């Protein structure tokens, strides 16, 4: 059935306008984004099929370009639109952290860092720079690729800390494998960075690792001491 023949309250776009985006299912949200279906499948049927194919909305959103554009009903235009939409969301989240108030809990920090890194298909390393009251100054991704002592340069982390006049920082990186437990390289890298930053009186408060589940705090698990 053509979606235009549905009752108005059941059409995804009208439902969103009447009840808000939070009332929509993943299928309906994707249908609103796609806008139209393909021959023989309305947009809701297309959306449902895509979610089945990719396994979840998250996996669809995190799919690489080749996998995304190869699906019927998708393509480079929709891929670029989706990437722009995701980046808008990330930037909105970043700017929503008010500099005037410190992050109110370690859990809030972990949620923020997970939102900033979980979409990355490859390994990345970043820093959340903080002032003397542990209020956020800036978040930056500094390195991409395999994260180990050979690819993360302490002098660059020190330089960025000086640029932001940071008094403390929180290190973070993701594990695309989904496993959050730190490797020996992760531990050694963290200790090396702590020593380097101590020379300019900048404290490393934690190193957060982002995987599929809850973000892991190396301090809370005893791998390092703040």
UniProtKB/Swiss-Prot annotation:
Domain MPN span(s) in chain numbering: 102-224
GO molecular function: metal ion binding; metallopeptidase activity
Keywords from the UniProt entry: Hydrolase, Metal-binding, Metalloprotease, Protease, Zinc
Membrane spanning residue stretches: none
The UniProt record lists the keyword Metal-binding: yes
Domain of life: Bacteria
KW Protease (keyword) present: yes
CDD domains: MPN_DUF2466
GO annotation, biological process: proteolysis
PROSITE patterns: MPN, UPF0758
Motif (JAMM motif): 173-186
Entry binding sites for Zn(2+): 173, 175, 186
Disulfide bonding pattern of the chain: none
Assigned protein family: Belongs to the UPF0758 family.
The name this protein goes by in its record: UPF0758 protein Pput_5194
Species this protein is from: Pseudomonas putida (strain ATCC 700007 / DSM 6899 / JCM 31910 / BCRC 17059 / LMG 24140 / F1)
């Amino acid at each position: 059935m053509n979606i235009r023949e549905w009752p108005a309250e059941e059409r995804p776009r009208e439902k969103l306008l009447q009840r808000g985006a939070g009332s929509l299912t993943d299928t309906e949200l994707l249908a609103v984004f796609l806008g139209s279906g393909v021959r023989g499948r309305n947009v809701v049927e297309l959306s449902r099929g895509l979610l089945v194919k990719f396994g979840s909305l998250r996996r669809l959103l995190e799919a690489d370009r080749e996998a995304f554009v190869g699906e019927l009903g998708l393509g480079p235009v929709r891929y670029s639109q989706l990437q722009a939409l995701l980046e808008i969301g990330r930037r909105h989240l970043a700017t929503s952290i008010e500099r005037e108030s410190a992050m109110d809990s370690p859990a809030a920090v972990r949620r923020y860092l997970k939102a900033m890194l979980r979409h990355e298909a490859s390994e990345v390393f970043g820093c959340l720079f903080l002032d003397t009251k542990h209020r956020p100054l800036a978040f930056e991704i500094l390195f991409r690729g395999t994260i180990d002592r050979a690819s993360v340069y302490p002098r660059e982390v020190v330089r960025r800390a000086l640029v932001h006049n940071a008094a403390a920082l929180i290190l973070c990186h993701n594990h695309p494998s989904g496993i959050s437990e730190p490797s020996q390289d992760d531990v050694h890298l963290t200790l090396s960075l702590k020593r380097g930053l101590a020379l300019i009186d900048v404290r490393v408060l934690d190193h957060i690792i982002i995987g599929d589940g809850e973000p892991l705090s190396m301090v809370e698990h005893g791998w390092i001491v703040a």
